[in-house]
């Protein structure tokens, strides 16, 4: 007697597989890196094969890509957008200016996006090539697959 095949997995693996293969970035382009980020949306790099679809609304996004110089006036707005994103959410800091302030070490610039929001992946360069952003998304997918999808200390809701 032959038995039907059974798929054994954990709920964590299933949720992480779905999350890692449907990344929807919120593009937050501020300077030169934004041009390279726009190039990744073209047919040459084809982010659709990774399940990545650029979104304009933070409520539909789970990844924020910060590309370029972050000024102190933009910092509050960027934090508000980050807070509007649903959980789980990830942040990619793209370029030297977003990572460390770059060459703009002035009173008006934030010296690194990680002072405003928690950053998961840093992309070095001025400006990083589209291939680098593509690689960063692949690294983020791997990071999501290895993470815990279900938090043990999550508060229980009473309905």
Curated annotation (Swiss-Prot):
Protein name, as recorded: NADH-quinone oxidoreductase subunit B
Lineage: Bacteria, Pseudomonadati, Campylobacterota, Epsilonproteobacteria, Campylobacterales
EC number: 7.1.1.-
Enzyme class name: translocase
Gene3D superfamilies: 3.40.50.12280
Designated gene of the protein: nuoB
InterPro entries given in the database record: NADH_UbQ_OxRdtase-like_20kDa (IPR006137), NADH_UQ_OxRdtase_20Kd_su (IPR006138)
Keyword rRNA-binding: no
Membrane topology, record value: Peripheral membrane protein
UniProt: [4Fe-4S] cluster binding residues: 32-33, 97, 126
Predominant subcellular localization, coarse grouping: membrane
Keywords, ordered alphabetically: 4Fe-4S, Cell inner membrane, Cell membrane, Iron, Iron-sulfur, Membrane, Metal-binding, NAD, Quinone, Translocase, Transport, Ubiquinone
Pfam short name (any one): Oxidored_q6
Catalytic activity of the protein: a quinone + NADH + 5 H(+)(in) = a quinol + NAD(+) + 4 H(+)(out)
KW Transcription (keyword) present: no
Assembly notes: NDH-1 is composed of 14 different subunits. Subunits NuoB, C, D, E, F, and G constitute the peripheral sector of the complex.
Cell compartment(s), UniProt: Cell inner membrane
Function (record text): NDH-1 shuttles electrons from NADH, via FMN and iron-sulfur (Fe-S) centers, to quinones in the respiratory chain. The immediate electron acceptor for the enzyme in this species is believed to be ubiquinone. Couples the redox reaction to proton translocation (for every two electrons transferred, four hydrogen ions are translocated across the cytoplasmic membrane), and thus conserves the redox energy in a proton gradient.
Biological source species: Helicobacter pylori (strain G27)
Record GO cellular component, one term: respiratory chain complex I
Cofactor binding description: Binds 1 [4Fe-4S] cluster.
Recorded family membership: Belongs to the complex I 20 kDa subunit family.
Needed co-factor(s): [4Fe-4S] cluster
Molecular function in Gene Ontology: 4 iron, 4 sulfur cluster binding; iron ion binding; NADH dehydrogenase (ubiquinone) activity; NADH:ubiquinone reductase (non-electrogenic) activity; quinone binding
